[in-house]
Amino acid sequence: MTETAPWTTRKPTAMLVLADGTVIEGTGIGATGKVQAEVCFNTALTGYEEILTDPSYLGQIVTFTFPHIGNVGTNEEDIEDLTPAARRGAVGVIFKADITDPSNFRAVKHLDAWLKARGVIGLCGIDTRALTAWIRENGAPNAVIAHDPNGVFDIEALKAEAKAWSGLVGLDLAIEATSGQSSTWTETPWVWNKGYGTLGEADAKYHVVCVDFGVKRNILRLFAGLDCKVTVVPAQTSAEDILALKPDGVFLSNGPGDPAATGEYAVPVIQNLIKSELPIFGICLGHQMLGLAVGAKTEKMHQGHHGANHPVKDFTTGKVEIVSMNHGFAVDTKSLPEGVEETHTSLFDGTNCGLRIVGKPVFSVQHHPEASPGPQDSHYLFRRFVNLLRENKGEAALAER
């Protein structure tokens, strides 16, 4: 009879320590070190590179419920943050399975090497279903994720750091995610066998100013695909400076952090923009900013919405859409003032997902209609906004669908 090798387990090289003292051990991936952040879970099956580079995830550790992440590697085309060198996005990641060698014709770099290059700390080899269930029952926790190849950790110190972190409430992260200076965007959406295109100067019919709270590239591409030249301006740009650019419309972008904190400087600007009668469109944090600007309130959610399979009802059409979401705060529907209508609602929990000002060309949605990753059910919202620009120019409306 041959002897069998004794049962062995790998020494933990990474840890997730929750604020309540829970310690989860795993195998480290990506960058080494430690970081305090909020833990959330994302239910999308694809698009991990877009998710991890979404600036809205700044200050968060993303747990992927899909077990196999990294199979198709990474590339330079799927990055979503506007300035990749700044590496704005998720600060930590948690996977069920080890990262395998990539197998895809578009793969340029292994996900582990990509995480290292971006400074993202990761942990794999844990029961992500159990962690997701914990978050679902208890809410998104503050935590510390740590990675040491030698497996040396001061657990008590990590517990203290996790407990001491104040969390996302009251935190203005848009100031970190925003661009440092103004820029012009002309890249159009990706086309099979052609890649991304460029909107020529002669083809730009409309001028949109994007207030950048942490904007995603695919949002800007969809504007360019509808013949909009986009000028991206930093989050703290004044209404006077925005109007001096003579835009046909203004876009309020997505972004991270507590909307109430960002609203300290953004809300007065948006209120002045509303008075200008220009068309205004907001997404995600931009939606929350608009809500605050009209007098509504925002609130921290129990676990947030993060995924590409969320059902939302559009009251303006009566249709249900499957959309991509990524937010931990929401506009309180009950706080919407007279003259402001709720246009969309989540069919998961009834939270607000859209609003418009009656009698003004101003509207916003909580979800991500640019579908990166995710379904394209809500692409019509970009055409709805462009139709407001066309109306001001006396042009016929585009078909929304």
From Swiss-Prot:
Residues 1-203 are annotated as: CPSase. Pathway: Amino-acid biosynthesis; L-arginine biosynthesis; carbamoyl phosphate from bicarbonate: step 1/1; Pyrimidine metabolism; UMP biosynthesis via de novo pathway; (S)-dihydroorotate from bicarbonate: step 1/3. CDD domains: GATase1_CPSase (cd01744). Keywords: Amino-acid biosynthesis, Arginine biosynthesis, ATP-binding, Glutamine amidotransferase, Ligase, Nucleotide-binding, Pyrimidine biosynthesis. It comes from the Bacteria. One of its GO terms (molecular function) is carbamoyl-phosphate synthase (glutamine-hydrolyzing) activity. L-glutamine binds at S56, G255, G257, L285, Q288, N326, G328, F329. The keyword Nucleotide-binding applies. The keyword Cell membrane does not apply. Residues 207-395 form the Glutamine amidotransferase type-1 domain. The active site is at C284 (nucleophile), H368, E370. One of its GO terms (biological process) is glutamine metabolic process. It catalyses: hydrogencarbonate + L-glutamine + 2 ATP + H2O = carbamoyl phosphate + L-glutamate + 2 ADP + phosphate + 2 H(+). It holds the Pfam family GATase. InterPro entries: Anth_synth/Amidotransfase, CarbamoylP_synth_ssu, CarbamoylP_synth_ssu_N, CarbP_synth_ssu_N_sf, Class_I_gatase-like, CPSase_GATase1, GATASE. Its EC number is 6.3.5.5. Composed of two chains; the small (or glutamine) chain promotes the hydrolysis of glutamine to ammonia, which is used by the large (or ammonia) chain to synthesize carbamoyl phosphate. Tetramer of heterodimers (alpha,beta)4. Small subunit of the glutamine-dependent carbamoyl phosphate synthetase (CPSase). CPSase catalyzes the formation of carbamoyl phosphate from the ammonia moiety of glutamine, carbonate, and phosphate donated by ATP, constituting the first step of 2 biosynthetic pathways, one leading to arginine and/or urea and the other to pyrimidine nucleotides. The small subunit (glutamine amidotransferase) binds and cleaves glutamine to supply the large subunit with the substrate ammonia. Belongs to the CarA family. This is Carbamoyl phosphate synthase small chain. It comes from Agrobacterium fabrum (strain C58 / ATCC 33970) (Agrobacterium tumefaciens (strain C58)). The gene is carA.
